[in-house]
């Protein structure tokens, strides 16, 4: 039951319910050039949003639960209400969901998006490095999440990119999450502070020392930390294999 509540708390974007930034601040415009804003049309025709991040000129990494009938990626954005000159809007050619993804324990919540064309790298649009397969981020590390998600449980999603600093927790802090698995997931956010990713932030990155170690996956419906992020290092071989065969 709790796993289902968690899933409801961050199943997709603004309008369907996905992670967002609570307790954070507005980002300096274009200071996170790898950030991707995903405009999604679901199989039911709903329009929702997720986050993602650019890892090569033609691939964006995000959460598998951000899948949809159609996805358009906006790169180089800060305020998504505006047609900023820095923005590059590209449709997704192919959604590649991890073959072991299961929405009920929400394991392997990772997806690659192949863009219809390669992006132009600029000061506002650039890739972010991934960890090595053996590089596990450890408890106590301070990392950053960013996104255009909700800024409060009852608030709308943000038009401008926001970010929040979060602590990596020991796996014991996520004991309430029945299906949490250390090898595949990261326990993120101190329960003593209300700082979190929330609805609309799903699929966005967790940056530790400039490296994308996590993907916003799911959390409690009231946004109380900690939350669960997909552990990127575990999936680096899969990511590389997909890119090599799909390029």
Curated annotation (Swiss-Prot):
InterPro entries: Peptidase_S1_PA, Peptidase_S1_PA_chymotrypsin, Peptidase_S1A, Trypsin_dom, TRYPSIN_HIS, TRYPSIN_SER. Residues 1-18 form the signal peptide. One of its GO terms (cellular component) is extracellular space. Pfam families: Trypsin. SMART domains: Tryp_SPc (SM00020). It comes from the Eukaryota. GO terms for molecular function: serine-type endopeptidase activity. Its EC number is 3.4.21.-. Keywords: Disulfide bond, Hydrolase, Protease, Serine protease, Signal, Zymogen. Disulfide bonds join 50-66, 143-208, 174-187. Residues 19-20 form a propeptide. Residues 21-244 form the Peptidase S1 domain. The keyword DNA-binding does not apply. GO terms for biological process: protein maturation; proteolysis. This enzyme, isolated from small intestine, specifically inactivates the apo forms of a certain group of intracellular pyridoxal phosphate-requiring enzymes. It has chymotrypsin-like specificity towards small substrates. Belongs to the peptidase S1 family. Granzyme subfamily. This is Mast cell protease 2. It comes from Rattus norvegicus (Rat).
């Amino acid at each position: 039951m709790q796993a289902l509540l968690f899933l409801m708390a961050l199943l997709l974007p603004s309008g369907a319910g996905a992670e967002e930034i609570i307790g954070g601040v507005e980002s300096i415009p274009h200071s996170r050039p790898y950030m991707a804003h995903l405009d999604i049309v679901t199989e039911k025709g709903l329009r929702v949003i997720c986050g993602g991040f650019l890892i090569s000129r033609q691939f964006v990494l995000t959460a598998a639960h951000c899948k949809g009938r159609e996805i358009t990626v906006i790169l180089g954005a800060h305020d998504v209400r505006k047609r900023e000159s820095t923005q590059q809007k590209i449709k997704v050619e192919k959604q590649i969901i991890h073959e072991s993804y299961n929405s009920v324990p929400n394991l392997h919540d990772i997806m690659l998006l192949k863009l219809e064309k390669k992006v132009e790298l600029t000061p506002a649009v650039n890739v972010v490095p991934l960890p090595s397969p053996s590089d596990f981020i450890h408890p106590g590390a301070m990392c950053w999440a960013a996104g255009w998600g909700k800024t409060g449980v009852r608030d709308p999603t943000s038009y401008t990119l926001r970010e929040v600093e979060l602590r990596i927790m020991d796996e014991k802090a996520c004991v309430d999450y029945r299906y949490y698995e250390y090898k595949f997931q990261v326990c993120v956010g101190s329960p003593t502070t209300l700082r979190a990713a929330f609805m609309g932030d799903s699929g966005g990155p967790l940056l530790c020392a400039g490296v994308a170690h996590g993907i916003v996956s799911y959390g409690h419906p009231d946004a109380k930390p900690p939350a669960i992020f997909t552990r990127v290092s575990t999936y680096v071989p899969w990511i590389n294999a997909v890119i090599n065969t799909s390029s």
